[in-house]
Amino acid sequence: MRTPQLSLLVAAILVASASTATSAYSQQTAPVPNVRSFVQVIRLKPDMVNEWIEIQRNEVIPAQKKAGITSRTTLTTQVGNAFEYSIITPFPKWEAFDSDAPLVKALGRDGAAQVNAKLRKCIMTQYSYMTNRVDSLTIPAPDALVWRIAVRRAVPGKMNDYLAYYRAEVLPGLRKAKASGQIAGSTIAIRGVGAPSGEFTTVTYYANFAGIDGGDPLVQALGREAADRINAKSAEFSTATQVFVRRRIADLSF
């Protein structure tokens, strides 16, 4: 989920500025990312997974709710790095870092230190980054079990074009796939501080893993010829770097 100080600024400039490219999409106004989240990606020690889950369930989540965290999504990687978990929480303003962390607000400094000490014993590696979801390009599916995540990198100067292409070409097909029950939803999010510049994700949500067996939702919704034409255009604006599948953990989310 990676120079961090500049990446959010670069992503914002790429989205907000008009592209100088001559593609058919260059004159369209791309939507601005408007929901920012803080993502933690945690690799656990294999023998400490169950303990970490119990600490999250019994200590961390109650403290987060007490501190006023409004939502949290916890994912485990089904296909990708083993023993890897992701926690996504809202991050509306940077001023959040000027005050106490949620655990400190809820438990006090001593209580938070005790919980963090327990968590550190479970963790092998951990990193974090910001992500900016584009709401106008999102088909919501907040409780979807399965997330198929494609990490992509925009061709320099082409982020604006990619978002316009996605809105004009991809989103209508995904809406049709949603209406027919082939997918639960979808979203696109631009990664910011903590991630490489120009990196973004497209996420397809499914109610279960069997949904992935249907293949490309654009093929299902529009037919092979139309889907191939649409997919071929994406190479003008971005390259795919990684695809993996994650599962939402309901009792570690709220």
Task: Name each model feature, range by range.
Residues 9-19:
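Bacterial N-terminal signal peptides
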Residues 1-10:
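Bacterial N-terminal signal peptides that target proteins for export
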Residues 22-254:
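Short S/T/G/P-rich N-terminal loop/turn motif that feeds into the first structured element of a domain
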